[in-house]
Amino acid sequence: MVSFSSLALALSTVVGVLAAPGSEKYVELAKHQLTHSQTGTKNGYYYSFWTDNRGQVSYTNGKGGQYSVNWKDCGNFVAGKGWNPASAKTVTYSGNWKPSGNSYVSVYGWTQNPLIEFYIVESFGSYNPSTGATELGTVESDGGTYKIYKTKRVDAPSIEGKKTFDQFWSVRTSHRVGGTVTTKNHFNAWAKSGLKLGTFNYMILATEGYHSSGSATMTVS
């Protein structure tokens, strides 16, 4: 996922009794709602919204670390708020996530030199992202057990364009949507398993969907 070589901002149509076209609330909501890939900073947080432009996906920046995303019959998207540059910080989050099909809630990000895409998966929908991957170990953190995996993407979209790169995973065995994620615990466990991160690029509390529908409203700090 995630190639930002050609980004565009599109304001989507918003309809509803509480946000009628021409109303102040309508105009304010439209300013923050995205339907095409974009990154930026809003209310002190970095945000990243990437979509392959298949199906219907809309992302809305809320106040502070809050965001919402709605999707219907999507291809693939990843959306969320966090930090750029990232660090081994402790992430606290809460939210309401209602997927129908394949979707994840994760602490998600990238490093460079080497180019690594990483996930700390808190919950997933109909598909376990570790399916077919070899388990490299486990890490106990924040009241749960996470299984560690490594996978490879070949000629796939990345923050550096189409590249071949590794993906590092921690997948929580007991699902949750809300709590604290001590990322340092995962990064240290990955290193002990021979998984070397590079220099941090960005890291977000992400909602991802793949050929699915759903909605999510999340807040991160």
Curated annotation (Swiss-Prot):
Its main location: secreted. Keywords: Carbohydrate metabolism, Glycosidase, Hydrolase, Polysaccharide degradation, Secreted, Signal, Xylan degradation. It catalyses: Endohydrolysis of (1->4)-beta-D-xylosidic linkages in xylans. Residues 1-19 form the signal peptide. Transmembrane segments: none annotated. Pathway: Glycan degradation; xylan degradation. Residues 33-221 form the GH11 domain. Its EC number is 3.2.1.8. PROSITE patterns: GH11_1 (PS00776), GH11_3 (PS51761). Gene3D superfamilies: 2.60.120.180. The active site is at residues 117, 208. It is an enzyme of class 3 (hydrolase). One of its GO terms (cellular component) is extracellular region. GO terms for molecular function: endo-1,4-beta-xylanase activity. GO terms for biological process: xylan catabolic process. It is found in: Secreted. Pfam families: Glyco_hydro_11. Endo-1,4-beta-xylanase involved in the hydrolysis of xylan, a major structural heterogeneous polysaccharide found in plant biomass representing the second most abundant polysaccharide in the biosphere, after cellulose. Belongs to the glycosyl hydrolase 11 (cellulase G) family. This is Probable endo-1,4-beta-xylanase B. It comes from Aspergillus clavatus (strain ATCC 1007 / CBS 513.65 / DSM 816 / NCTC 3887 / NRRL 1 / QM 1276 / 107).
